[in-house]
């Protein structure tokens, strides 16, 4: 959600418009990079390959236009007829500048049964699936991957703005570097699995407490309501056992997939605790103001504190409060009574106006007119020609407007 600029800095209105996030550090963004966290949780993630990218390949992703390597098609007799033409233009092959990366991508596709889904360090090119023949992230060839990466605004953000609104991390050095660290970019190829989108969930963690959960797909699925308690229990146990004490940052957002029969939880992604991460069915202001769930409290055996927590069923193990219990403890218990017992698990309800968006195109703001895409794929000259034609059209429209105003 974008922040709204205000001229009255420091005013109450301005303060409300600024979400109360803690500073987002460079290290937090790096910890959410796939190549950092996936090796720590390899057994919890779907099968994948991580390919380090060379500077020449990163430059290719930065470059304007979409120029793909030639497909490896066998020559035909018609091709032989023109092979001796000295004026024939050789088809551009950008992969000549990064042959190692190209070869590793081919090899990884073969190792992962011929179908993969790509992403960079943080983002997958989900906004570019309209460019794919399958209308999803499924890729069978290197060119399928290059086309998605080159067409995606999400990938461009990974490349150009990974540390927007971040601050240096002072916990690692008394004199932190003021400039953002250099990013070692990687291409992640995950074995293609036809995920059931209704069983993907986003989970929000604040100060190592699982705060709330929601479904990722914003359509209504009636069967999820019967499974809500089971799924919440699975996610809570997964977090407590696998992520709570092992991830370096205390606040983060993680995505999971829990396929039928809903016994195993797969870790799909880890995202920053930052405004750039989509809160989906929540708002960030709502999340930041949430009280921590108190969970199932156990009896305290400490002789010093001499009081007993309430158990899950709400019955105290003692009829009277110990005399040593202080007023502050009463206030704490009163605050806990107001707090939720379990993390909120939000699902799309049947009567939600957004519940039936099957025909609504995702990421439509990132799409381009077909003419622009076609021009970019003809090579560097194609886009220049298209821009020239576009300027001519605008010029003619301006002349026609001037003529009409004179009349």
Swiss-Prot record:
Record-listed ATP binding positions: 119, 122, 124, 126, 190-191, 200, 202, 216, 255, 269, 271
Keyword Cell division attributed: no
One GO BP annotation of this record: eukaryotic translation initiation factor 2 complex assembly
GO CC annotation terms, alphabetical: cytoplasm
Positions contributing to Mg(2+) binding: 269, 271
Bias-annotated ranges (Acidic residues): 77-92, 325-339
The entry's keywords: ATP-binding, Chaperone, Cytoplasm, Magnesium, Metal-binding, Nucleotide-binding
One Gene Ontology term of the molecular function aspect: ATP binding
Compartments, as annotated in UniProt: Cytoplasm
Chain spans, region Disordered: 68-99, 312-346, 374-407
Family per similarity comment: Belongs to the CDC123 family.
Function: ATP-dependent protein-folding chaperone for the eIF2 complex. Binds to the gamma subunit of the eIF2 complex which allows the subunit to assemble with the alpha and beta subunits.
Protein name stated in the entry: Translation initiation factor eIF2 assembly protein
Biological source species: Emericella nidulans (strain FGSC A4 / ATCC 38163 / CBS 112.46 / NRRL 194 / M139) (Aspergillus nidulans)
């Amino acid at each position: 959600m974008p922040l709204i600029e205000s001229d009255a800095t420091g005013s109450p209105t301005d303060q409300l418009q600024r979400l109360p996030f803690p500073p987002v550090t460079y290290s937090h963004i790096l910890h959410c990079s796939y190549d950092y966290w996936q090796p720590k949780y390899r057994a919890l993630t779907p099968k994948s390959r991580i390919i380090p990218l060379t500077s020449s390949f990163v430059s290719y992703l930065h470059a304007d236009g979409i120029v793909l390597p030639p497909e490896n098609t066998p020559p035909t007799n018609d091709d032989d007829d023109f092979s001796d033409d000295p004026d024939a233009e050789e088809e551009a092959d950008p992969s000549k500048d990064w042959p190692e990366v190209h070869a590793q991508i081919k090899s990884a596709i073969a190792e992962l049964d011929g179908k993969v889904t790509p992403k960079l360090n943080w983002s997958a090119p989900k906004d570019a699936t309209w460019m794919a023949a399958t209308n999803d992230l499924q890729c069978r060839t290197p060119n399928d991957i290059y086309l998605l990466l080159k067409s995606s605004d999400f990938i461009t953000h990974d490349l150009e703005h990974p540390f927007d609104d971040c601050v240096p991390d002072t916990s690692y050095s008394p004199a932190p570097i003021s400039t953002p660290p250099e990013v070692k970019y990687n291409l992640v190829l995950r074995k293609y699995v036809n995920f059931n989108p209704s069983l993907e969930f986003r989970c929000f963690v604040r100060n190592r407490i699982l705060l709330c959960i929601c479904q990722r797909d914003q359509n209504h699925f009636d069967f999820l309501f019967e499974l809500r308690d089971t799924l919440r229990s699975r996610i809570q146990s997964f977090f407590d056992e696998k992520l709570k004490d092992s991830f370096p940052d205390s606040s983060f957002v993680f995505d999971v997939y829990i396929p039928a029969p809903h016994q195993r939880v797969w870790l799909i992604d880890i995202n920053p605790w930052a405004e750039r991460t989509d809160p989906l069915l929540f708002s960030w202001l709502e999340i930041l103001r949430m009280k921590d769930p108190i969970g199932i409290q156990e009896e305290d055996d400490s002789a010093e504190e001499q009081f007993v927590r309430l158990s899950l069923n709400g019955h105290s193990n003692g009829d009277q409060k110990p005399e040593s219990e202080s007023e502050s403890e009463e206030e704490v218990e009163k605050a806990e009574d107001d707090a939720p017992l379990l993390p909120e698990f939000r699902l799309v309800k049947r009567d939600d106006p957004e519940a039936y968006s099957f025909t609504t195109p995702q990421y439509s703001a990132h799409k381009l007119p077909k003419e622009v895409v076609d021009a970019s794929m003809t090579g560097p000259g194609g886009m220049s020609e298209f821009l020239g034609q576009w300027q001519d059209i605008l010029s003619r429209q301006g002349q026609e407007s001037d003529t009409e105003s004179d009349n």
